[in-house]
Amino acid sequence: MPHTIKKMSLIGLILMIFTSVFGFANSPSAYYLMGYSAIPFYIFSALLFFIPFALMMAEMGAAYRKEEGGIYSWMNNSVGPRFAFIGTFMWFSSYIIWMVSTSAKVWVPFSTFLYGSDMTQHWRIAGLEPTQVVGLLAVAWMILVTVVASKGINKIARITAVGGIAVMCLNLVLLLVSITILLLNGGHFAQDINFLASPNPGYQSGLAMLSFVVFAIFAYGGIEAVGGLVDKTENPEKNFAKGIVFAAIVISIGYSLAIFLWGVSTNWQQVLSNGSVNLGNITYVLMKSLGMTLGNALHLSPEASLSLGVWFARITGLSMFLAYTGAFFTLCYSPLKAIIQGTPKALWPEPMTRLNAMGMPSIAMWMQCGLVTVFILLVSFGGGTASAFFNKLTLMANVSMTLPYLFLALAFPFFKARQDLDRPFVIFKTHLSAMIATVVVVLVVTFANVFTIIQPVVEAGDWDSTLWMIGGPVFFSLLAMAIYQNYCSRVAKNPQWAVE
C-alpha cells in the first residue's frame, strides 16, 4: 500500500501562495514611483495578469504533476524541447539578473542596519567611486554565497525562516503604526489622496505611467511555482482555484493597502523628492519617516522622534538583510538545479552536471558565479551615479523576470490542445476561454516590457538605459539558442545521448 502524504488545507495553500508572492519592498517602490496612483495599476495587473496566469500554471502543474522537470517539462510536453529550453533558460537567466541586482542591493540594508541610513552612496575606498566600491562588495558577496551554498544549503534554512518572519512582522508594524498615527493625528494623511496623478515628476506622462505596469507585474512574480502545489492540496479540483483567487484578492488588497498606508506618514514632496532617494533605499527612507511621524504624533522631542525613525530604519535594515541572505542562498542554487538537472544531460558539458559530495552541482555554481561577477563589474564600472546604478539594475531585473511568463503563457494553448492528458484540475473549459486568457496575459506582459524599454529613449533620448534593459535578456536568449544548437549537433553524431 503506498504511503499517504498529508495534503495541504485551503488555508495552508493560501498562506503558501501569500508567502511566495507577497514582498514587503514592493509597496515602497510603488509609492516612490507613482504615489497613490500606483494602486489602480496593482489592481489592473492582478485582474489581467496574476489571476489568469496563476490558473494557467495550476492547470499545467496538475496535468504534469508526475514530471520532475518543472516548467521545462510543461513546455517540452506542450510545444517542444527547443521552445522549452529557451523559455526555461530565460527563466533561469532572470535569476542571474536578480543576483546581479541583489548582490549590490544587499549592502543597502546592511549599511542601514549599521548606520541608521543608506551610506552606500558615500563609500569611497582607494580612489574608487561609491558605485565601484559597491560593485566589488557585490562580487565578494557572490563568491561567499557560492562557497557556502556549494557545501549544502541546510545551514542557512534557519536564517531564511528568521528573515521571512521578520519581514512579515514589518507588514504588521506598518499597519499598526499607521493606524496609531491616524488616530493621534485625527485622521490626517501626510499625502493628499489622488489615485489619478503621480507626484513623481518622472512619472507624469502616459508612457511613463504605462511602463509602471512592469513593476506591478514584478510584485506578483513567482506565481509560476504555484502550479507545483496542485497535487499537495486537498480536493484540488475545488480548493486550488478558490485558494488562488482568494490569495490573489488578499495580495492585491494587501499591496494596495500598504501603498495607501505609506501616505499616512510620508509626504512625497517633503521626503521623497530628495535626489539621494532611489529604488535601492526607498524602503528604509519610508520606514524612517514612519518612525519619525509616530514620534511627532506622540509629541516626542525632535531628537527623540529622529532617534525613533533611525531605529525603525535599522530594524528594517536587519530584517531585509536577513531576508535577502536567505533568498540569495536559495536562489543561487534552485534555478540552476532546474536548468542543469531538469533538462537532458547532453545539453551540458559533463563537468557541469557533476555533483559534489554534498549533492550540489558545484562546478556549474562556480561558472554561474563567474558570469554574475562579469555582469556586476560591467555595470558598476560602466559609469553613472549610485542612484542610477540601483535604478538601472532594478529595471533590468523587472524586464528579465517577466519575459519567461511569455513563454509559459504561449505554451498554454498547445497544452490545452493535447487530448491524451489526465486533467484533474480544469478552469478554462472552452478553447475560447483559454485563448482569451493567453492573449490577455501575453498582451499585458508584452506591453509592460515594451513601454518600460522605450520610455527612456522617447522621453529623454536615454539610449544607455534602454540598451542595458534589452542587453540582459537578448544575451541569454542567444546563449540558449547556441547551447541548444550545440546539443542538437552532438545528438546527431551520438543518438544514444538523446535518451539520457
Swiss-Prot record:
Database matches in Pfam families: AA_permease_2
GO-annotated biological processes: amino acid transport
Membrane topology according to the record: Multi-pass membrane protein
Keywords: Cell inner membrane, Cell membrane, Membrane, Transmembrane, Transmembrane helix, Transport
Positions of transmembrane segments: 8-28, 38-58, 83-103, 133-153, 164-184, 210-230, 244-264, 320-340, 370-390, 395-415, 434-454, 463-483
Spans within the Periplasmic topological domain: 29-37, 104-132, 185-209, 265-319, 391-394, 455-462
Keyword Membrane: yes
Main location as per UniProt: membrane
Disulfide feature: none
GO MF term (any one): amino acid transmembrane transporter activity
Family listed: Belongs to the amino acid-polyamine-organocation (APC) superfamily.
Name under which the protein is recorded: Inner membrane transporter YjeM
